[in-house]
Protein backbone atom coordinates (compact mmCIF):
# COMPACT_ATOMS: atom_id res chain seq x y z
CA UNK A 1 0.00 0.00 0.00
CA UNK A 2 1.23 3.50 -0.76
CA UNK A 3 0.85 6.28 1.80
CA UNK A 4 1.69 9.93 1.24
CA UNK A 5 4.27 10.37 3.97
CA UNK A 6 3.08 11.54 7.38
CA UNK A 7 1.23 14.58 6.13
CA UNK A 8 -2.49 14.18 6.61
CA UNK A 9 -4.55 14.83 3.52
CA UNK A 10 -7.84 14.93 5.40
CA UNK A 11 -8.23 18.65 4.70
CA UNK A 12 -8.15 17.95 0.96
CA UNK A 13 -10.90 15.34 1.04
CA UNK A 14 -12.93 16.96 -1.73
CA UNK A 15 -10.04 16.56 -4.16
CA UNK A 16 -9.60 12.84 -3.56
CA UNK A 17 -10.84 10.22 -5.99
CA UNK A 18 -11.70 6.72 -4.77
CA UNK A 19 -11.33 4.03 -7.43
CA UNK A 20 -12.69 0.52 -6.81
CA UNK A 21 -11.73 -2.55 -8.83
CA UNK A 22 -14.16 -5.37 -8.02
CA UNK A 23 -12.68 -8.64 -9.25
CA UNK A 24 -13.87 -12.19 -8.88
CA UNK A 25 -11.30 -12.93 -6.17
CA UNK A 26 -10.18 -9.58 -4.74
CA UNK A 27 -11.53 -6.04 -4.54
CA UNK A 28 -8.94 -3.26 -4.57
CA UNK A 29 -9.66 0.27 -3.32
CA UNK A 30 -7.30 3.05 -4.38
CA UNK A 31 -7.27 6.70 -3.35
CA UNK A 32 -5.88 9.23 -5.82
CA UNK A 33 -4.85 12.82 -5.19
CA UNK A 34 -4.74 14.13 -8.73
CA UNK A 35 -2.83 11.53 -10.74
CA UNK A 36 -0.97 10.18 -7.71
CA UNK A 37 -1.99 7.04 -5.80
CA UNK A 38 -1.76 7.90 -2.11
CA UNK A 39 -3.18 4.75 -0.53
CA UNK A 40 -4.67 1.39 -1.46
CA UNK A 41 -6.47 -1.42 0.33
CA UNK A 42 -7.10 -4.98 -0.88
CA UNK A 43 -10.01 -7.07 0.42
CA UNK A 44 -11.35 -10.44 -0.66
CA UNK A 45 -14.47 -10.23 -2.82
CA UNK A 46 -17.37 -11.73 -0.90
CA UNK A 47 -20.85 -11.86 -2.40
CA UNK A 48 -22.48 -11.87 1.03
CA UNK A 49 -20.64 -8.78 2.32
CA UNK A 50 -22.87 -5.73 2.81
CA UNK A 51 -22.13 -2.05 2.24
CA UNK A 52 -22.12 -1.51 6.01
CA UNK A 53 -19.53 -4.24 6.50
CA UNK A 54 -17.34 -2.75 3.80
CA UNK A 55 -17.67 0.70 5.31
CA UNK A 56 -16.78 -0.61 8.77
CA UNK A 57 -13.68 -2.29 7.34
CA UNK A 58 -12.52 0.50 5.06
CA UNK A 59 -12.96 3.74 6.96
CA UNK A 60 -10.61 2.80 9.85
CA UNK A 61 -7.99 1.58 7.37
CA UNK A 62 -8.15 4.85 5.46
CA UNK A 63 -8.18 6.86 8.69
CA UNK A 64 -4.90 5.24 9.75
CA UNK A 65 -3.40 6.69 6.58
CA UNK A 66 -4.72 10.16 7.43
CA UNK A 67 -7.56 9.94 4.92
CA UNK A 68 -11.08 11.10 5.79
CA UNK A 69 -13.24 9.94 2.92
CA UNK A 70 -16.76 10.57 4.12
CA UNK A 71 -16.98 13.34 1.50
CA UNK A 72 -14.68 12.18 -1.29
CA UNK A 73 -14.45 14.13 -4.51
CA UNK A 74 -15.60 11.16 -6.57
CA UNK A 75 -15.93 7.38 -6.72
CA UNK A 76 -15.30 5.27 -9.82
CA UNK A 77 -16.16 1.56 -9.81
CA UNK A 78 -15.05 -1.13 -12.26
CA UNK A 79 -16.71 -4.45 -11.51
CA UNK A 80 -16.84 -7.89 -13.11
CA UNK A 81 -19.32 -9.08 -10.46
CA UNK A 82 -22.70 -7.55 -11.49
CA UNK A 83 -24.64 -8.75 -8.39
CA UNK A 84 -22.44 -6.53 -6.21
CA UNK A 85 -23.24 -3.28 -8.02
CA UNK A 86 -25.97 -2.31 -5.56
CA UNK A 87 -23.60 -2.90 -2.63
CA UNK A 88 -20.94 -0.57 -4.03
CA UNK A 89 -23.53 1.99 -5.06
CA UNK A 90 -24.71 2.21 -1.46
CA UNK A 91 -21.14 2.15 -0.11
CA UNK A 92 -20.22 5.16 -2.24
CA UNK A 93 -23.32 7.15 -1.35
CA UNK A 94 -23.43 6.46 2.38
CA UNK A 95 -19.76 6.12 3.30
CA UNK A 96 -17.94 8.24 0.70
CA UNK A 97 -20.66 10.85 0.31
CA UNK A 98 -21.05 10.87 -3.45
CA UNK A 99 -22.78 9.18 -6.34
CA UNK A 100 -20.52 6.53 -7.91
CA UNK A 101 -19.61 6.31 -11.57
CA UNK A 102 -19.66 2.73 -12.86
CA UNK A 103 -17.37 1.74 -15.72
CA UNK A 104 -19.57 -0.62 -17.71
CA UNK A 105 -19.34 -2.45 -21.04
CA UNK A 106 -20.33 -0.07 -23.82
CA UNK A 107 -19.06 3.04 -22.01
CA UNK A 108 -17.64 5.78 -24.23
CA UNK A 109 -13.95 6.24 -23.45
CA UNK A 110 -12.69 7.76 -26.67
CA UNK A 111 -11.17 4.40 -27.61
CA UNK A 112 -12.55 2.56 -30.63
CA UNK A 113 -13.45 -1.02 -29.67
CA UNK A 114 -12.78 -3.43 -32.57
CA UNK A 115 -14.88 -6.23 -31.12
CA UNK A 116 -17.79 -8.01 -32.79
CA UNK A 117 -19.98 -6.96 -29.84
CA UNK A 118 -18.22 -4.08 -28.02
CA UNK A 119 -20.58 -4.46 -25.07
CA UNK A 120 -19.04 -7.86 -24.33
CA UNK A 121 -15.68 -6.35 -23.34
CA UNK A 122 -15.52 -6.37 -19.54
CA UNK A 123 -15.08 -3.20 -17.51
CA UNK A 124 -11.72 -4.40 -16.20
CA UNK A 125 -10.37 -4.88 -19.72
CA UNK A 126 -11.64 -1.48 -20.84
CA UNK A 127 -9.93 0.23 -17.90
CA UNK A 128 -6.70 -1.69 -18.54
CA UNK A 129 -6.67 -0.76 -22.22
CA UNK A 130 -7.36 2.94 -21.70
CA UNK A 131 -4.77 3.19 -18.90
CA UNK A 132 -2.10 1.37 -20.91
CA UNK A 133 -2.58 3.64 -23.91
CA UNK A 134 -2.45 6.70 -21.67
CA UNK A 135 0.71 5.57 -19.87
CA UNK A 136 2.68 3.85 -22.62
CA UNK A 137 1.17 4.88 -25.94
CA UNK A 138 0.36 2.37 -28.63
CA UNK A 139 0.69 -0.30 -29.85
CA UNK A 140 0.71 -2.02 -26.47
CA UNK A 141 -0.37 -5.33 -24.95
CA UNK A 142 -1.86 -5.50 -21.45
CA UNK A 143 -1.56 -8.73 -19.46
CA UNK A 144 -3.77 -8.91 -16.37
CA UNK A 145 -3.19 -11.80 -13.96
CA UNK A 146 -6.43 -12.36 -12.10
CA UNK A 147 -8.95 -15.15 -11.71
CA UNK A 148 -8.60 -15.25 -15.48
CA UNK A 149 -5.46 -14.10 -17.26
CA UNK A 150 -6.34 -11.66 -20.01
CA UNK A 151 -4.27 -10.32 -22.88
CA UNK A 152 -5.60 -7.15 -24.52
CA UNK A 153 -4.11 -5.57 -27.63
CA UNK A 154 -4.22 -1.86 -28.44
CA UNK A 155 -3.10 -1.38 -32.03
CA UNK A 156 -0.90 1.35 -33.51
CA UNK A 157 -3.98 3.49 -34.16
CA UNK A 158 -4.80 3.42 -30.43
CA UNK A 159 -7.82 1.16 -30.94
CA UNK A 160 -8.79 -1.82 -28.83
CA UNK A 161 -8.09 -4.61 -31.31
CA UNK A 162 -9.29 -7.58 -29.25
CA UNK A 163 -7.80 -9.96 -26.76
CA UNK A 164 -7.31 -13.40 -25.30
CA UNK A 165 -8.82 -14.88 -22.12
CA UNK A 166 -7.03 -17.79 -20.46
CA UNK A 167 -7.64 -19.57 -17.14
CA UNK A 168 -5.79 -17.91 -14.28
CA UNK A 169 -2.85 -19.66 -12.67
CA UNK A 170 -4.69 -20.28 -9.39
CA UNK A 171 -7.81 -21.83 -10.90
CA UNK A 172 -5.64 -23.88 -13.25
CA UNK A 173 -3.76 -25.29 -10.28
CA UNK A 174 -6.99 -25.87 -8.36
CA UNK A 175 -8.37 -27.88 -11.27
CA UNK A 176 -5.30 -30.12 -11.13
CA UNK A 177 -5.62 -30.67 -7.37
CA UNK A 178 -9.36 -31.27 -7.63
CA UNK A 179 -9.22 -33.88 -10.38
CA UNK A 180 -5.99 -35.71 -9.54
CA UNK A 181 -6.66 -37.54 -6.28
CA UNK A 182 -3.03 -38.38 -5.50
CA UNK A 183 -1.70 -34.87 -6.07
CA UNK A 184 -1.73 -32.38 -3.23
CA UNK A 185 -1.74 -28.59 -3.04
CA UNK A 186 1.61 -26.81 -3.11
CA UNK A 187 2.68 -23.19 -2.96
CA UNK A 188 2.75 -21.64 -6.41
CA UNK A 189 6.29 -20.37 -6.82
CA UNK A 190 9.38 -20.75 -8.97
CA UNK A 191 10.96 -24.12 -8.13
CA UNK A 192 14.65 -24.53 -7.37
CA UNK A 193 15.12 -26.47 -10.61
CA UNK A 194 13.17 -27.30 -13.75
CA UNK A 195 13.09 -31.07 -13.24
CA UNK A 196 11.37 -31.95 -9.97
CA UNK A 197 12.89 -34.70 -7.82
CA UNK A 198 9.82 -35.03 -5.64
CA UNK A 199 6.10 -34.62 -6.17
CA UNK A 200 5.91 -31.09 -4.76
CA UNK A 201 8.81 -29.91 -6.91
CA UNK A 202 7.37 -31.55 -10.02
CA UNK A 203 3.98 -29.91 -9.47
CA UNK A 204 5.56 -26.51 -8.84
CA UNK A 205 7.64 -26.83 -12.01
CA UNK A 206 4.60 -27.79 -14.06
CA UNK A 207 2.46 -24.95 -12.76
CA UNK A 208 5.18 -22.27 -12.86
CA UNK A 209 6.91 -23.08 -16.13
CA UNK A 210 3.69 -24.17 -17.78
CA UNK A 211 2.23 -20.77 -17.06
CA UNK A 212 5.38 -18.91 -18.06
CA UNK A 213 5.23 -20.83 -21.33
CA UNK A 214 1.60 -19.86 -21.85
CA UNK A 215 2.33 -16.16 -21.34
CA UNK A 216 5.56 -16.14 -23.37
CA UNK A 217 3.94 -18.13 -26.16
CA UNK A 218 0.96 -15.83 -26.49
CA UNK A 219 3.11 -12.68 -26.38
CA UNK A 220 5.45 -14.12 -29.01
CA UNK A 221 2.53 -14.82 -31.31
CA UNK A 222 1.09 -11.36 -30.76
CA UNK A 223 4.38 -9.81 -31.81
Regions found by a protein language model. Give the residues of each.
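Short glycine-aspartate micro-motif
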Residues: 17-21, 76, 140-144
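ATP-binding/phosphotransfer module of carbohydrate and carboxylate kinases, centering on a glycine-rich
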Residues: 14-19, 45, 49, 175-223
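Glycine-rich phosphate-binding loops at beta-strand->alpha-helix junctions
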Residues: 26, 49, 78-85, 205
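Short, basic, low-complexity termini and linkers enriched in Ser/Thr/Gly/Pro
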Residues: 1-13
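Phosphate-binding/catalytic loop of phosphoryl-transfer enzymes
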Residues: 98-102, 107, 111-179, 209-223
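Short glycine-rich, Thr/Ser-proximal phosphate-binding strand/loop in the N-terminal lobe
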Residues: 12-63, 158-184
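Phosphate/pyrophosphate-binding loops at sites that engage ATP/ADP/AMP, CoA/4′-phosphopantetheine
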Residues: 58-74, 219-223
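Short glycine-rich phosphate-binding loop at a beta-alpha junction
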Residues: 69-80, 99-101
